[in-house]
Amino acid sequence: MKSERFRTELITNVSHDIKTPLTSIINYVDLLKADNLSEEEKAQYLDVLDRQSGKLKKLIENLIEASKASTGNLTVCPEPCNLNILQAQTAGEFTDKLTQAGLELILRKQQSTPMIDPNVDNADLPDLVITADSRHLWRIFDNLMGNICKYSQPGTRVYIDLATVDQCAQITFRNTSQYPLEQSTDALLERFVRGDSSRSTQGNGLGLSIAKNLAELMNGTLALHVDGDLFKVIVTFPLAIEEEYN
């Protein structure tokens, strides 16, 4: 019953996002049929077609992945995954997008003990290793960072924090939203709304849902915390047993 409701809401909530790039593609194909176009105009129209077809392709991929993830119909290949390396790789991958969005990314490695200030990075702490599917784990990071780049207030700092809590690795993504966050966290995860009631921003709201389902497929959890315009996503996985990766 839940998976059936998921599919129904999935189709309903993203239908507008499918129509937008599709309509644009149809319109620009018609424009290209004109006989009196200059080479510059043709190049501009082709550029729009390239961008819109890319958006449509990405949306279809997200729809397929969201459906598979919600039903557990995805292959999981567990292996040791170093979160410190992934944290650094994420910073590198998103350098350009963060710069374009006017955001500063802060990476921190923390340990939840009274002996260490959780607000101070400690390079001597051991790396955090979990057992997960590296492809799905990257997709979680990619989706969450994509949301951060789209919806954060320009000129603010965003954070990816690593911490150990009760034999678990905890990854916290934190940012300041440029849109009101009035919806409940359940609504943000279950109904694919984006945090703003309008549809003036890009995206289809599937990223959080996909990330949550992927985390759960790998024995992890994903939780949201909203405090005014402050938005946190906390992803938690059991730490790998040392024998598994040594």
Predicted regions located by residue number:
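Short helix-loop "hinge" at the ATP-lid/N-box region of the Bergerat-fold HATPase_c
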Residues: 148-149
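Short conserved segment of the HATPase_c
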Residues: 180-193
